[in-house]
Amino acid sequence: MTLEITGSELIKSKLIDAPERSGVYRMFDVNKQVLYVGKAKNLKKRLTNYIKSNLDNKTLRMIANTCFLEYSITNSEVEALLLEAQLIKKFQPKFNILLKDCKSFPFIKLRLEHDFPQLLKYRGKTLSDGKFFGPFASSVDVNTTLTELQKIFKLRSCTDNYFNSRTRPCLQYEIKRCYAPCVGKINKEDYRDLVTQVKDFLQGRTKELQENLSRKMEELSSQMRFEEAAEIRDRIKALSYVQLKAGVSDVVKDADIIAIVEKNGHYCVEVFLYRAGQACGNIPYFPTSTENSTKEEVLEYFLLQFYQKQHVPAAIIINHEINDKENVIEAIKKINNILQLNITVPNKGGKAKLVQNAEINALFSLEQYLKKFAKNQEIIFEIKELFGLSAIPERIEIYDNSHIQGKFAVGVMVVAGKVGFDKKEYRVFNVYAPSLVCHSRESGDPKRLMDSCFRGNGIKNCWGDIKGDDYEMLRQVLTRRLTRLRQEPHKLPSLMIIDGGKGHLGVVKEVMDKFEMNIPFVCMSKGVDRNAGFEQFHVIGKEVFTLDKNLPVMKYLQILRDEAHNFAIKNHRLGRSRAIKISRLDDIEGVGETRKKALLHYFGSYKAVCDATIYELAKVNGINKLLAEMIFNVLHRKN
């Protein structure tokens, strides 16, 4: 493709028609991939800045790569801010300040629709059908809190199906973490009282809760019910301990404390969560593409990206002012459909102390991050030298597969870069039988037939039965990956590492030649006895070589290989479990998803359905006697 003008000349040509209004502009590279998204109060003035002479290196690189420029006019600065945030989230442009690995925070959910409510962990933006507490900074914080709550209040954590199928108490009852409502060890009224206590505790009403429990303990003691009184006493002690360990604030009730710090051009933003006056954990973030950016810019971009995924508290307390605070507040309110929000920078008092504490933690987190970053940089440079790469690798893709005697085969790709693993870029490839792949290619769509088969009941017969052919697995995975890379050239890896030996080397070369691509690759195989530390490396045109197992670069390569290996095993097991769940019920004519769910809900498990009589089967809604007989006969026939 021949482009008439690019870079600063392109921007100059666009300035002629650029309006003096608020809006958002987008810069694209030669492949129409978004390089940068920016907002402007005045589009013409903002674009004029890009043709000045005093630009920093990052901006100069961006302009040099710009081949296309588009802009959209908005009705206000707030709309421009909103559109910019949405486009950054969608396209993740390489020259924008980006917030990586920002998962939604987990909650504790109390399911109230059941007679005996369940306490469980929940992650998601939509909070409905229950009572929610949190968010918490990590799964560890949620799991720790849930464990403590189960020890103190002994509410059930099992699913409804498991609950309905119990005939005797489970292990949770034996270790005193559940009152076993499934088998009637506690009545509804007493259980509901425990649910109320849990809600009081999680909503921060601990003082009232402890006073109520103390009164109840005295009543039980006066009635000579000493065992029950002792249990209440232990609950009060446990609550005091948990409260002390978690940390309670009288300064803030519902707030996020956010501190930003900078060192050597790198930034860390530390977030502390407080809900109902209780500390719910903290987590550090390290925004990328922050070269030549100010604290104000980084913090503004952080807030807009962070609160697209997270629930907004009543107050956001930060350690540094941002330039466009009022518009940022309005944008966050619109994103989350809320009416009230305060963003403040305290100078003194209890809130200032909380911010100071967040700053101390942020500095510590940044120092640890920079040590890890520097070590990674050294190792990545060694990888460049080791495999004769033309430049320091920005993106390394590692491939592995997993199967059992060729069954349920999956291939995986994990991705690593300068700052570690990029889990958003991980991919899973379900590997299909060669005959199916050939047939689907002949039909003109190499994936449609396989996907339809995978969704259907023939999953065991069409997916993953590859007869243990590692080369065919790799051939399929790389064919699909390189096909995708043709559509996404900006994601071309600097290096591919394949878990395999000399034979795999030939397969990779074959697929590369077919696609006329020349991506550097290496195959990494275990030694003669398959022991870690004796890995062999296979590169086209070189003799097989090994590395000293104590070298940092060798340990790093092992970490990459192990990450791919573990990811492959995890997804193989998921696929196998999915296939195993397809039972004989799927072979019965007249039993679709609705009736299958009705059977499993009524009896609680597949085994219980198998053990049921014809009379019991006919009791299920939607199952008549004739169908019950058919189900019974199919479930009891010999293989």
Curated annotation (Swiss-Prot):
GO cellular component: cytoplasm; excinuclease repair complex
Gene3D superfamilies attached to this UniProt entry: 5' to 3' exonuclease, C-terminal subdomain, GIY-YIG endonuclease, UVR domain, UvrC, RNAse H endonuclease domain
UniProt keyword DNA repair, yes or no: yes
Gene Ontology BP terms: nucleotide-excision repair; SOS response
PROSITE patterns assigned: GIY_YIG (PS50164), UVR (PS50151), UVRC (PS50165)
InterPro entries per record: GIY-YIG_endonuc, GIY-YIG_endonuc_sf, GIY-YIG_UvrC_Cho, RuvA_2-like, UVR_dom, UVR_dom_sf, UvrABC_protein_C, UvrC
Top-rank taxon: Bacteria
Compartments where located: Cytoplasm
Pfam name, any one: UVR
Domain GIY-YIG: from-to ranges: 20-97
Ranges of residues in domain UVR: 207-242
CDD domains: GIY-YIG_UvrC_Cho
This protein's record includes keyword Membrane: no
Molecular function terms from GO: DNA binding; excinuclease ABC activity
Coiled-coil segments: none
Alphabetic keyword roster: Cytoplasm, DNA damage, DNA excision, DNA repair, Excision nuclease, SOS response
Family label: Belongs to the UvrC family.
Biological role: The UvrABC repair system catalyzes the recognition and processing of DNA lesions. UvrC both incises the 5' and 3' sides of the lesion. The N-terminal half is responsible for the 3' incision and the C-terminal half is responsible for the 5' incision.
Subunit description: Interacts with UvrB in an incision complex.
Entries under PANTHER family matching the protein: UVRABC SYSTEM PROTEIN C, UVRC/OXIDOREDUCTASE
Protein name in UniProt: UvrABC system protein C
Gene: uvrC
